[in-house]
UniProtKB/Swiss-Prot annotation:
Catalyzes the synthesis of beta-nicotinate D-ribonucleotide from nicotinate and 5-phospho-D-ribose 1-phosphate at the expense of ATP. The keyword Ligase applies. This is Nicotinate phosphoribosyltransferase. The lineage of its organism: Bacteria, Pseudomonadati, Pseudomonadota, Gammaproteobacteria, Vibrionales. Pathway: Cofactor biosynthesis; NAD(+) biosynthesis; nicotinate D-ribonucleotide from nicotinate: step 1/1. The gene is pncB. GO terms for molecular function: nicotinate phosphoribosyltransferase activity. One of its GO terms (biological process) is NAD biosynthetic process via the salvage pathway. SUPFAM superfamilies: Nicotinate/Quinolinate PRTase C-terminal domain-like, Nicotinate/Quinolinate PRTase N-terminal domain-like. It catalyses: nicotinate + 5-phospho-alpha-D-ribose 1-diphosphate + ATP + H2O = nicotinate beta-D-ribonucleotide + ADP + phosphate + diphosphate. The modification Phosphohistidine is found at H231. Its EC number is 6.3.4.21. Transiently phosphorylated on a His residue during the reaction cycle. Phosphorylation strongly increases the affinity for substrates and increases the rate of nicotinate D-ribonucleotide production. Dephosphorylation regenerates the low-affinity form of the enzyme, leading to product release. It comes from Vibrio vulnificus (strain CMCP6). The keyword Repeat does not apply. NCBIfam families: NAPRTase (TIGR01514), PRK05321.1 (NF003704).
């Protein structure tokens, strides 16, 4: 019997995913209909997920049963008018083919430990939706296996304490520029936990909650679906056009794809300095704002505001969105720092969707969310990279490609570090020890 925070089938709706995946799906369908990609699961935390391999495979294979039904398509047409009739017709016929597109197995790390491996291969627009679905599946299976004893009351208590703190601090500090969207789908404790959390938020702080990145829950709770674009859009262009032009082309193509709607630019695929070099007057004018996802939010925001001012653009007409590992305390510090200097908004995920406070099990181990990502590794057979403004978030399988990318964008290339990284990558080369059934 599943506890109240879990359900037998994890993904029960094709809309139980992040808004930006469908946005990028349309853009890939329009501009790059034959582009082939590969995604890889990267587990950053110390969790050994190899024991979950069969359950993960089973849940992913269940995705083949999902369909976009007429009511869901009508909802998308209403809430996302930038999605074209042609694309919605495509969604009507869309099917997942996980047995052909997703490989689930186990590999051995350089340290000799076993770890879960999930690889996604296929045409970009046919495989792009797997990312958030796979991550939601893995997180819930892990928590159902090892943390099923956590009661729903613990989630309520943690949320209520956080909202009490938020209410107190907003009043004490007289902060009036705090608004946020819920963005916890990929790393949620479980679907039921995310749903419970959103129900609490809309009851306690409806005036602060802008919406959610989850289409299914937005529809169920009549909230605004929120989302624009992710790193993979810029990463893919590293293989689709001349590498030195990739970021500019990605920015231009995004505007073209939605006629200027969804105009929030993500700045850290190559790094903030490289981004600003490409974010010229035309682009800075056309885009409604920018999103921070790594590095110091204060240094980043100062650079963005200075850049707008250097172009003769009033930064108070633009929106700065912060989405990097936020809690309420950090968000309020950002609000105070940028008050009156720009419009501010936040996307908050794990802090709301996967925090059980100081809950410990009978062995004295405190609950911690799993840290993982599913990121594009190749596009049309060529490597792609995310450099980031935070070294721990950098991702690339090919050190030579990464060095070339940095050089093309005028970033420092540390040869000694590159050599050591190459040696480390060789030591960490994955050895598959269990093939896909």
């Amino acid at each position: 019997m599943c506890a109240p925070l879990f359900q037998p089938a994890i993904i029960q709706s094709v809309l139980d995913l992040d808004v930006y995946k469908i946005n990028m799906m349309q853009a890939a369908y329009r501009f790059y209909p034959q582009t082939q990609v590969r995604y890889e699961l990267i587990v950053r935390s110390d969790d050994n997920l190899s024991d979950l391999v069969e359950e993960v495979r089973e849940e992913i294979n269940r995705l083949a049963e999902l369909r976009f039904d007429a009511a869901q398509l009508a909802y998308l047409a209403e809430k996302a008018p930038y999605l074209t009739a042609e694309f919605l017709s495509y969604l009507e016929t869309f099917r997942f083919h996980p047995q052909q597109q997703v490989s689930v197995g186990i590999f051995r790390t350089a340290q000799g430990d076993c770890q879960l491996r999930v690889t996604i291969n296929g045409i970009w627009h046919e495989t792009i939706l797997y990312e958030t679905l796979v991550m939601s599946i893995i997180s819930e299976l892990r928590n159902r296996r090892y943390w099923a004893q956590i009661p729903q009351s613990q989630l309520h208590k943690v949320l209520e304490d956080k909202l009490d703190f938020l209410d107190s601090e907003l009043k004490r500090r007289n902060i009036t520029n705090f608004r946020f969207s819920e963005m916890g789908t990929r790393r949620r404790f479980s679907f039921a936990a995310q749903k419970t959390m959103l129900d609490v938020l809309r009851a306690r702080v409806p005036e602060l909650l802008l919406g959610t990145s989850n289409y299914h829950l937005a529809q169920e709770f009549n909230l605004t679906p929120i989302g624009t674009v992710a790193h993979e859009w810029t990463m893919a262009h590293q293989a689709l056009v001349a590498i030195q032009h990739s970021q500019r082309v990605a920015l231009d193509k995004w505007l073209e794809a939605f006629n200027g709607s969804l105009g929030i630019a993500l700045t850290d695929t190559i790094g903030i300095d490289a981004f600003l070099s490409d974010f010229d007057l035309d682009k800075a004018t056309a885009y409604a704002g920018v999103r921070h996802d790594s590095g110091s939010p204060f240094v980043w925001g100062d650079k963005i505001i200075a850049h707008y001012e250097s172009l003769g653009i009033d930064p108070t007409t633009k929106t700065l969105i912060f989405t990097d590992g936020l809690d309420f305390a950090r968000a309020l510090d950002i609000c105070e720092y940028f008050a009156g200097r720009a419009q501010i908004s936040f996307g908050i995920g794990t802090f709301l969707a996967n925090d059980m406070g100081n809950w410990t099990n009978d062995k004295g181990t405190r609950y911690q969310p799993i840290s993982m990502v599913v990121k594009m590794a190749e596009c049309n057979g060529s490597p792609v990279a995310k450099i980031s403004d935070e070294p721990e978030k950098a991702m690339c399988e090919d050190i030579f490609f990464l060095m070339n990318l940095k050089q093309r964008f005028g970033l420092e290339v540390d040869l000694d570090k590159a050599i050591e990284t190459l040696k480390q990558m060789k030591r960490q080369q994955k050895k598959r020890i269990q093939s896909v059934a």
